[in-house]
């Protein structure tokens, strides 16, 4: 997977691509925090999909898109009893799956797992913009089984 970003005062954008199992590639782009658009790129007899993708990558780089080196650790924390229950662990796994989808399709980052014990349960995410990601997550969790979180916080700021 290749992820490129362009952050200006006016707009924050992402562009990413990944290989699919069938030999095609998916290209996904948009404004950071939105689902954006996507397309499938398939090769032909005369042109491999990698060449088509490389041309797009070159265009994006010439337009100011770059990989982002710095990611922020965003944690979603829940209060639990003691070391937690089987149901708590299952809920954490469902939330991890949801965050992988939510953050990935919004161009924000990915979920990296979680932890449980000593009265709290956390889901760990790596994101390129903490404030945008926090806002997207708050909206995504509202009205779901996951809305009862204690806090969403930036680990490095603690």
PLM region descriptions:
Residues 106-135:
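Short, intrinsically disordered low-complexity segments
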Residues 44-61, 134-141:
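A short, charged, amphipathic alpha-helix used as a generic interaction element across diverse proteins
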Residues 1-6:
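Short, hydrophobic/aromatic-rich segments at coil-to-beta transitions
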């Amino acid at each position: 997977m290749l992820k490129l970003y362009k952050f200006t005062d006016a707009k924050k954008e992402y562009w990413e691509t990944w290989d699919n199992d069938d030999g095609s590639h998916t290209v996904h782009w948009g404004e950071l925090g939105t689902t954006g658009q996507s397309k499938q790129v398939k090769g032909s007899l005369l042109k491999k999909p990698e060449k088509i993708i490389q041309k797009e990558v070159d265009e994006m780089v010439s337009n100011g898109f770059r990989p982002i080196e710095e990611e922020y650790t965003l944690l979603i924390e829940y209060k639990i009893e003691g070391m937690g229950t089987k149901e708590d662990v299952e809920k954490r796994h469902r939330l991890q799956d949801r965050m992988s989808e939510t953050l990935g399709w919004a161009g924000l980052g990915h979920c990296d797992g979680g932890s449980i014990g000593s009265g709290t349960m956390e889901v760990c995410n790596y994101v390129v913009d903490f404030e945008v990601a926090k806002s997207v997550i708050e909206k995504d969790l509202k009205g779901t089984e996951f809305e009862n979180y204690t806090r969403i916080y930036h680990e490095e700021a603690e």
